[in-house]
Each structure stands twice: as C-alpha cells, then as structure tokens.
C-alpha cells in the first residue's frame, strides 16, 4: 500500500520542485530494497527446508571430501542412529521371611554330594533375609550388538556378577552370538533369574546337579532354523569353573553345552516347548561342601575336605505347556513345567580329615531326578502353584568309605500363592513339605516380596 501511495503521489503538479521528486524516488528505492530483502530471506528459508528434507546419503556424500583429507580419523555412524550410551536400568528388590521347623545348618540332600557354598542351595536362614536383589544395565552398543550387566546382591555372597555379556543383534540367517558371563541355556529354568521363578527356591535337581544355577564364562551360539516349525539349536564353550566343573589352571575348554529346542502353538489358546540339553564339564579338585550322610550334632567332620577330579556329564529333558483363553493371559492362565536330569560322573575322589590319613580312590556315579510344577492364575493378579521334586540316588561306586551314601531318595512337595497388585511387585507365601534328609521331615514356610524399579525386559517363553 505504501508503494501505491508513493506511485499515486508521483502525479504531482508541474510546479513541484526537484527536491520533492528526489525524495519520492528515494522512498521508492527504499521500499524496493526492503521487498527484495524479504524475498531473498524467504528464498533462503525455502532452500534450507529443501536441504533438510533430502535423504541422509546426500549429507554423507557432501561430507565425503572432508573425510578424505583425514584418513586416520575414526568414521562416525550417521547421527540418525541412536547408539549413544543410554542404558536401561532396573533394580529388583527381594526379601524373604523363613519359618523352618528343622535347623537349616543340618540341611542336606542325603545320598548326594553337593557343591561347596552353593548359590540357592538349601532353605536358607531362619527369620528375615534380604534374599537376592539385583541391579541390571542393558543397552544397544550399535546396530550390530547389545550389552548387559546384572549384579546380584546377597548377604552371604556380597556383590556378585551374575551376568556380563555382549550379544549380536544383526547377524543373518537366524544366528545369534553371545560372549562373556551368562546363565547357560541348559534346560528351561536355568536361564531365568531368581525373580522370574514361580517358587521361592530352586528345584532339587538344580540344587543337586547345578549347585543352584549354572553360569558359563565363555561363548554361546544359537541358530533358529528357517523352517515353519520353530527349531533352535545351540552350543556353548566355556572355562567350566562353575559346578559341576571347577577352577582349572588350563588354557583348554572346561565345559561344553549343546541344546536343541522346538515348540509352537496349538490353536489360539495353547503353546508348548520341548528341549533337550547336554553338559560335559571337567573338574580338577572340585570341592564337595555338603551332602554327607552323618549326624551333624557334633564336630565329627569339622575341617573335613572332600575333592573330586574327573568328568561330569549331564543330560536334561525339559518341557513347558501354556494355556490362556484366546492367548489372553490377563484374567486366567495355566502353565505346566517340568525337567528331568540324569548325571554320570567318573574320576578320582579323596577325603581328608584332620589328624587322619588321606582317603582316596576311584569314584563313579549315575544319579537322576525330576520335578513337575503347575501354576494356575485363577483371577487377575492371583496365582496358585503346586510343585513336586524327587531325586533318585541311583548307583555310586567308590573305594572311599566316607563317600558311600546311605540309601535315600530325597523328595519335596511345595504349594504357593502369590498376588501381583501391579507388574512391578509381587507378594508370595509358600509351604514346603521337605524330606531331603534321611528320616527327617521339615515343614518350611516362606513369605516373599519382589519389587521392580525401572525398565525391565520381557521374560522368555
């Protein structure tokens, strides 16, 4: 409008002086300059918007000449990849109260030699206990790998590195690699952290044959076959220092694990998985810390040391069946889970007691066990469970008298009820009818809480 006024004002009377004409021309020039500046600014904004809308390769190509001048520089991935160290962190707080009829210090699996200082072996201490709390960190390293660390917190073991591994995320053909420390894929429950268990304690087979839970320091490879039926094959190679192995001053492999799994769906409401696993571990001076079949009332075996050197082979058959109406487990569901273990060991064993000569000789054993448990969610947030454990002493042949077991097949029946007011907390009561010791019945009552803080990944099938 100012321009129109100025142009209209240009039709001046003939008597207008030169000064007025000059002033009008200056005003017109100023207006023209302002409009040209605004048009140029709008053109620059349009050009910038077009550049930002272009695909990332164009920006990469534009930066190529600069990169060529510095060949020693580390190539950085595109900023569009969110690979910054921003791990998800979670904390699991767990605690228990235990009421035990029998002294837990006398607990044993009669007929079985247990590992020394087992993690999760036995009913634990009476009264209030911290239980097993854990802190976990997990993050993508880049587009090809992720990493995870889980620290366990316990009164007896202090701070323990439960898991610390890196795992591939982008290998082709269904292959996944893992390296570091991790819970072995042996059987079904061994891979799970304690807060994911359906009962307070581990099954007898895990306590007797894996000293509670088996960790592997080494590498793992998994391969999901390209078939319509889900089939997964895997192998693990490690140092074998965890029970049934032992610390070894050797460069060779101490343990090998092989496993195969298959599963699928039956209609919309049922799913299943079957697995078979095999573990071979080499033990050198493996310490046995419990499981003898003698009276604990005195100091008869104070300072006694039992050692085993040889081979341990373990076969595991596991199965899981899950039901949820139309696949919706929010209101009601059922899970049936079971595992069968069979172990064979052969080698040399020795027993050293204070002020007595060393007893040593050959040792061969073949022992087995199983458990079966069912978990029924009868309404939202409420579940009830029943579990039965049983071990078979099998055969033990040894020339070492103190390793000759008394005849006993430990068994236990457990019932539990838990309530989860939200996905971040669970309260549980459990009662065990424990007959692990020869001629002794122990009624065990547990109260447990579990709280989850922060982001926590979904559990496996």
What are these regions (language model features)?
Residues 1-12:
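Gram-negative bacterial Sec-dependent N-terminal signal peptides
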Residues 14-118, 230, 453, 457-461:
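N-terminal periplasmic/intermembrane-space "pro-region" immediately following the signal or transit peptide
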Residues 17, 38, 124, 129-133, ...:
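Short N-terminal amphipathic alpha-helix/helix-capping patch enriched in small hydrophobics
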Residues 23, 36, 43, 47, ...:
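Acidic-residue sensor for enzyme active/binding pockets
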Residues 47, 54, 171, 184-187, ...:
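Generic short alpha-helical segment signal, independent of protein family or function
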Residues 76-243, 250-268, 366-368, 373-394:
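Outer membrane beta-barrel
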Residues 165, 270-461:
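Outer-membrane beta-barrel pore domains
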Residues 244-248, 305-306:
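Active-site rim elements
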């Amino acid at each position: 409008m100012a321009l129109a006024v100025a142009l209209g004002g240009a039709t001046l009377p003939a008597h207008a002086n030169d000064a007025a004409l000059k002033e009008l021309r200056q005003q017109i020039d100023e207006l023209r300059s302002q409009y040209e500046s605004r048009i140029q600014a709008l053109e620059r904004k349009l050009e910038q918007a077009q550049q930002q809308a272009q695909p990332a390769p164009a920006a990469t190509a534009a930066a190529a000449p600069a990169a060529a001048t510095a060949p020693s520089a580390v190539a950085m991935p595109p900023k569009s990849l969110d690979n910054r160290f921003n791990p998800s962190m979670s904390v699991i707080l767990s605690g228990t109260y235990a009421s035990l009829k029998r002294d837990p210090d006398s607990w044993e699996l009669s007929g079985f030699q247990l590992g020394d200082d087992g993690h999760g072996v036995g009913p634990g201490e009476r009264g209030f206990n911290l239980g097993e709390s854990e802190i976990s960190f997990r993050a993508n390293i880049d587009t090809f790998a992720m990493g995870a660390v889980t620290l366990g917190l316990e009164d007896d073991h202090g701070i323990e590195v439960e898991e610390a591994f890196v795992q591939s995320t982008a290998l082709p053909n269904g292959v996944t690699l893992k390296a570091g420390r991790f819970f072995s894929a042996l059987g079904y429950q061994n891979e799970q952290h304690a807060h994911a268990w359906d009962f307070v304690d581990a099954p007898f087979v895990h306590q007797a044959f894996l000293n509670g839970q088996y960790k592997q320091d080494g590498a793992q490879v998994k391969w999901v076959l390209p078939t319509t039926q889900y089939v997964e094959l895997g192998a693990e190679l490690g140092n074998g220092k965890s029970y049934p192995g032992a610390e070894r001053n050797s460069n060779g492999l101490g343990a090998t694990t092989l496993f195969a799994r298959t599963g699928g769906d039956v209609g919309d409401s049922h799913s299943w998985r079957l697995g078979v696993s095999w573990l071979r571990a080499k033990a050198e001076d493996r310490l046995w810390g419990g499981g003898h079949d003698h009276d604990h009332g005195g100091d008869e075996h104070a300072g006694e040391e039992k050692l085993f050197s040889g081979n341990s082979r373990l076969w595991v058959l596991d199965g899981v069946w899950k039901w949820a109406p139309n696949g919706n487990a929010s209101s009601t569901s059922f899970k049936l889970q079971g595992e069968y273990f069979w172990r064979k060991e052969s080698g040399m064993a020795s027993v050293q007691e204070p002020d007595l000569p060393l007893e040593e000789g050959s040792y061969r054993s073949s022992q087995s066990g199983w458990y079966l448990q069912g978990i029924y969610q009868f309404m939202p947030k409420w579940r009830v469970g029943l579990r039965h454990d049983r071990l078979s002493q099998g055969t033990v042949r040894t020339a070492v008298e103190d390793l000759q077991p008394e005849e006993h097949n430990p068994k236990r029946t457990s019932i539990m009820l838990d309530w989860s007011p939200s996905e971040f907390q669970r309260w549980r009561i459990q009662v065990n009818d424990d007959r692990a010791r020869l001629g002794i019945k122990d009624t065990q009552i547990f109260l447990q809480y579990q709280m989850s803080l922060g982001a926590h990944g979904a559990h496996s099938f």
